[in-house]
Amino acid sequence: MTPALRKAIGFLRLRGVNDLPDGTVEIDGTNVFAIVQRYDTVKTDVPKFEYHQQYIDVQFIASGEEVIGWAPRERMLLTEAYDAGKDIAFGTVEKGKWTAAYLQAGQLAVLFPEDGHAPKNAAGAESSVMKIVVKVAR
């Protein structure tokens, strides 16, 4: 594990991390930082996939549950071209060509730049989620 990924995981193990307000938390400047967010998951037959080139995502579910779709990024049909300023592109993946990862409170997924991923999907019924996404520069 790289030192930056170690910092990301170490941050998620801190006491009180579940009490953080929404927003950005600096961990190691622009090399490692966290985005705290709360939202309701959605039911959909066509998940909205995304990918990043500059950062690895460590997506930690602090409370609630969700399904994150995963597929190799080359399977994505882009609906919004890559925006380098925001480090994100959006697209879809043909049904049957992606995998669903079920995450519940206390679990995480590490998503690399080659990974297309579709967060915020309901795991059955729609539910409220608190997620901390730690961004780790490649």
Place the predicted regions along the sequence by residue.
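A short hydrophobic beta-strand segment most commonly corresponding to one strand
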Residues: 108-110, 126-138
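Short acidic (Asp/Glu) patches
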Residues: 36-52, 84-97, 118
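Short, conserved beta-strand element in jelly-roll/cupin
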Residues: 53-66, 72-74, 80-93, 135
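A short, N-terminal "cap"/entry segment at the start of jelly-roll beta-barrel domains
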Residues: 1-36, 43-51
